[in-house]
From Swiss-Prot:
EC numbers: 3.6.4.13
InterPro entries (alphabetical): DEAD/DEAH_box_helicase_dom, Helicase_ATP-bd, Helicase_C-like, P-loop_NTPase, RNA-helicase_DEAD-box_CS, RNA_helicase_DEAD_Q_motif
Database matches in PANTHER family: ATP-DEPENDENT RNA HELICASE DBP3 (PTHR47958)
Underlying gene: fal1
Family to which the UniProt record says this protein belongs: Belongs to the DEAD box helicase family. DDX48/FAL1 subfamily.
Residues in Helicase C-terminal domain copies: 236-397
Binding-site positions, ATP: A68, Q69, S70, G71, T72, G73, K74, T75
CDD domains the UniProt entry points to: DEADc_EIF4AIII_DDX48, SF2_C_DEAD
Protein name: ATP-dependent RNA helicase fal1
Catalytic activity from the UniProt record: ATP + H2O = ADP + phosphate + H(+)
């Protein structure tokens, strides 16, 4: 039984199943080589909490309920699971993802296409409000994965353009929202057309009774994964940008700031492992003391670098996003984005602080003319303001 304290209660006790193990790296998941390449090219270095627990269960074919909010890496969790189990040689729909909104369905399609970049995967977003003729053309051509909203998907199945006989997996993303928006009948409609052995994966931020009621009808002995998100906030963080005309000038700008950096401890983020190595060498050549870390390093080496940094033995750490997720060093009060993050969720992971500590801090973004759009996008996404850096930035840190 999934719930522990009365079926009609909305306060459901939910915990991770005992058989769920943690895969610390993507290599430990025994994924296809072409998929692994896509994962690294997408910018992932190590799996998030939900990814390290749920991907293996999904790949094993288990019905899975993952309670996870957005920002935890849930979309990539089921996308990687889907890409591992489909056979791209067979040009038929083998996985179906239902989402509550058109935007989410389209976003999922782009994640699947990006992660499956080396697999030659066909994925179509089948959503309301778009040209039906285009849907029919795409579906008749053959799609390995369909990501859509329940109404349009049910319609395409009824019209026999979306063929269901090869479907192995159904994913319900944001299941609580799907039911909130009154999609229950359409979901049941779709489910009726699927082969009896279809694997079902449910992802939901909350698990109200109606979600669990649906899972009992659709799922067989589901494995459960619960991941709580560490709420991150930008509150109390002063955010600035420095306009740098050319990429090559970032280095001099960083050197000018070095004395300011070492007032406390600083982390400098670059987007690639190669850039981290390059910047570390260049800083050392210029006689600056820095340490560096990225996902290619053996875990042992990473641990010892982290320990040095935690103890304050090293004051400036250059890293990729591998450092950003969930590593909390109390005394870091300055973060520099040498490169702006390629995906905006990583911005808060780099500079945000978990509410438990609510520390003050300063973030400085190096912005070339190409980056202005990304910076504006970050401001909009987080409803925050990033100002030009004042001259007295050192005073803000001391």
């Amino acid at each position: 039984m999934i719930w522990a304290n009365g079926a009609n209660s909305d306060r459901l006790e939910f915990s991770t199943s005992k058989e769920v193990t943690v895969a610390p790296t993507f290599e430990d998941m025994h994924l296809k080589e072409s998929l692994l390449r896509g994962i690294y090219a997408y910018g992932y270095e190590s799996p998030s909490a939900v990814q390290s627990r749920a991907i293996v269960q999904i790949c094993k074919g288990r019905d899975t309920i993952a309670q996870a909010q957005s920002g935890t890496g849930k979309t990539a969790t089921f996308s990687i699971g889907i890409l591992q189990v489909i056979d791209t040689v067979v040009r038929e729909t083998q996985a179906l993802v239902l989402s509550p909104t058109r935007e989410l369905a389209t976003q999922i399609q782009s994640v699947i296409m990006a992660l499956g970049d080396y697999m030659n995967v066909q994925c179509h977003a089948c959503i309301g409000g778009t040209n039906i003729g285009e849907d029919i053309r795409k579906l008749d051509y053959g799609q390995h994965v369909v990501s859509g909203t329940p109404g349009r998907v049910a319609d395409m199945i009824r019209r026999r353009h979306l063929r269901t006989r090869h479907i192995k997996m159904l994913v319900l993303d944001e299941a609580d929202e799907l039911l909130n928006r009154g999609f229950r009948e359409q979901i049941y409609d779709v489910y009726r057309y699927l082969p009896p052995a279809t694997q079902v994966v449910v992802v939901s931020a909350t698990l109200p009774y109606d979600v669990l009621d649906m899972t009992t009808k659709f799922m067989t002995d589901p494995v459960r994964v619960l991941v709580k998100r560490d709420e991150l906030t930008l509150e109390g963080i002063k955010q600035y940008f420095i306009a740098v005309e050319k990429e090559e000038w970032k280095f001099d700008t960083l050197c000018d700031l070095y004395d300011t950096l070492t007032i406390t401890q600083a982390v400098i983020f670059c987007n690639t492992r190669r850039k981290v190595d390059w910047l570390t060498d260049k800083m050392r050549e210029a006689n600056f003391t820095v340490s560096s870390m990225h996902g290619e390093m053996p875990q042992k080496e990473r641990d010892s670098i982290m320990q040095d940094f935690r103890q304050g033995n090293s004051r400036v750490l250059i890293s990729t996003d591998v450092w950003a997720r969930g590593i909390d060093v109390q005394q870091v009060s300055l973060v520099i984005n040498y490169d702006l993050p390629t995906n905006r969720e990583n911005y808060i992971h780099r500079i945000g602080r978990s509410g438990r500590f609510g520390r003050k801090g300063v973030a400085i973004n190096f912005v070339t003319s190409d980056d202005v759009r990304i910076l504006r996008d970050i401001e909009l996404y987080y409803s925050t303001q990033i100002d030009e850096m004042p001259m007295n930035v050192a005073d803000l840190l001391s």
